[in-house]
UniProtKB/Swiss-Prot annotation:
Maturation-removed propeptide residues: 22-31
Gene Ontology process terms (BP): cellulose catabolic process; xylan catabolic process
Lineage, broadest ranks: Eukaryota, Fungi, Dikarya, Ascomycota, Pezizomycotina
Ranges in coiled-coil conformation: none
Name of protein: Acetylxylan esterase A
GO cellular component: extracellular region
């Protein structure tokens, strides 16, 4: 009996040890080699075929933050990894960097299709969101320290991510982009080019722009990421008017009076840069004489994200704080918008919303006003 019991215990011990080793091996295999750019597959639903690359620093923090860094047209994850300061800053502050890569020819991002511009719609935005949730799960990341940034087409996608998945991000920085929904394709084309938007001809009010962003996640009432918007006055790819329209959009989302900012600071953060603050959640930075795109200000990003600031003992080298990226925006078929008609009961007041994807309120305006189509997400009584 004693011999049998001893044999049973030995067998049980070996079984549990091997089972534990197999489980540990699976967990380890899901993680990547620290200190180099690595591709990740199997991160979740990925209908658009977007590629995921990740940089895990050797100096990984406990419960690390995450920065999603999104490349420009013609760019790649590798190009943005080498051409931006985020991997260097990750070693300093211990956060993980996700570098998505566009699946399309020319590698612009899909910021035009209904799928991409809708929460859980299955486009590029959904794939990137799934990269974030995978990384949170694998590395026990701090969900209060997840951020998104990008340049040019990546800046457009940054605005889209902030609108479609506001629950995932605490803050965003946008380098030379356009507002969320500005590139919308009436033909539902993925990765479409919109010349009207690019040239700054799509002009609207904060209420309309804000409604467009909000309707990308209809019914959402939680917190939204703080937005920092950069643009250059000499941008001839995505014209400077897009700076004002993007700032209008987020002023509308946060309920700020766009025409009455709290402060305007000249020569901040650099000479010929003007910083405008509408409130704690929105800051615009307009760079006079700067083209496409505004150089990445890594140190300012770290302050905006909360990795550095007053009381921080860390210092950032100049080489890791401001980085110029070469971005090329390829021209594709221009898509125009067309009006839609819906029927419902009730009456919307002047300036009120009267239509849009996911809208369940009144679609008839009070006497004297017309329900005016802006895009698929927003119509307004004007």
């Amino acid at each position: 009996m004693k011999s049998l019991s001893f044999s049973f215990l030995v067998t049980l011990f070996l079984y549990l040890t091997l089972s534990s080793a197999r489980t540990l091996g699976k967990d380890v295999n899901k993680r990547v080699t620290a200190g180099s750019l690595q591709q990740v597959t199997g991160f979740g639903d990925n209908a658009s075929g977007t590629l995921m690359y990740i940089y895990v620093p050797k100096n990984l923090a406990t419960n690390p933050g995450i920065v999603v860094a999104i490349h420009y047209c013609t760019g790649t994850a590798q190009a943005y990894y080498t051409g931006s300061p985020y991997a260097q800053l990750a070693e300093q502050y211990g956060f993980i960097v996700i570098y998505p890569q566009s699946p399309y020819s020319g590698t612009c991002w899909d910021v035009s299709s209904q799928a991409a511009l809708t929460h859980n719609g299955g486009g590029d935005s959904n794939s990137i969101a799934n990269m974030v949730t995978w990384t949170i799960s694998q590395y026990n990341a701090n969900t209060a320290k997840v951020f998104v940034t990008g340049s040019s087409s990546g800046a457009m996608m940054t605005n889209v991510m902030a609108a479609t998945y506001p629950e995932l991000f605490a803050a965003a920085t946008v380098y030379s982009g356009v507002g969320a929904g500005c590139f919308y394709s009436s033909s539902n084309q993925a990765d479409a080019w919109n010349s009207s938007c690019a040239t700054g001809s799509v002009i609207s009010t904060p209420a309309v722009w804000g409604g467009i962003a909000k309707n990308m996640y209809s019914g959402y009432s939680g917190s939204r990421p703080r937005m920092q918007i950069y643009h250059g006055s000499a941008d001839t790819t995505l014209y400077p008017q897009n700076y004002y329209e993007t700032c209008k959009q987020w002023a509308g989302v946060f309920g700020y009076n766009y025409d009455s900012p709290q402060s305007t600071l000249a020569n901040t953060p650099d000479a010929n840069y003007q910083t405008t603050n509408w409130g704690p959640n929105l800051q615009g930075i307009y760079a006079t004489g700067v083209g496409h795109t505004v150089p990445i200000h890594g140190a300012k990003d770290m302050e905006w994200f909360g990795f550095s600031g007053s009381g921080s003992s860390s210092t950032t080298t100049a080489s890791a704080t401001k980085t110029s990226t070469t971005s090329t925006t390829s021209t594709k078929t221009t898509s125009s918008t067309s009006s839609t008609t819906t029927s419902s009961t009730g009456v919307a007041a002047h300036w009120g919303q009267c239509g849009g994807s996911g809208w369940t309120g009144p679609t008839v305006c009070e006497s004297g006003y017309t329900c005016t189509y802006s895009n698929a997400w927003y119509s307004q009584c004007l």
